[in-house]
Amino acid sequence: PTLVANYIPAGIEVMLQSENGLLGMGEFPDEETIDADMINAGKQTVTAQTGAAIFDSAQSFAMIRGGHVDLTVLGAFEVDVAGNIASWMIPGKMVKGMGGAMDLVAGARNIIVVMTHASKNGESKLLPQCTLPLTGVGCIRRVLTDLALLEIVDGAFVLREVAPGVSPDEVIRKTAGRLIVADDVREMRFS
């Protein structure tokens, strides 16, 4: 999700917010424009767009909790066919924690999950029911993985697009939750 700013097509105006208090976050800097004091919530250096605003995290979360965020892009450990998301804890393992994810799933109008389709050991992360503690309940409608773009509709993942070189059959094999292949599945375009 932190890479989103690098992939916004030219001519499209988007105002990205970082939870730590930057509205108007730009893409990752090159060596000439790097500023070690300009970071996102993940502590990665970023740039600021013209007209950006910098404020404290309390103000940032007031915007998020107040419903002033149109869209959020989150990573996840698991998503299920009911639109539930687990993104903050794996029992018995050290992970960074939830950060602002619970605020974002409750306060943003739309949520897109961006994640790998399978875990490091090859197990599907798209499940009939999440097995990990939930971050949000019934709030996810769209999931983008390294294999596919899926929507969650009526208790099923609906396959809408496949990544270049990926077949619908591969997505079927690697999805544990109920999956419906749309009649008009197409290949993702990156231009």
Feature map (PLM): residue ranges:
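Conserved phosphate- and dinucleotide-binding cores of soluble alpha/beta proteins
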Residues: G24-S191
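N-terminal low-complexity or amphipathic/hydrophobic leaders
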Residues: P1-E19, L23
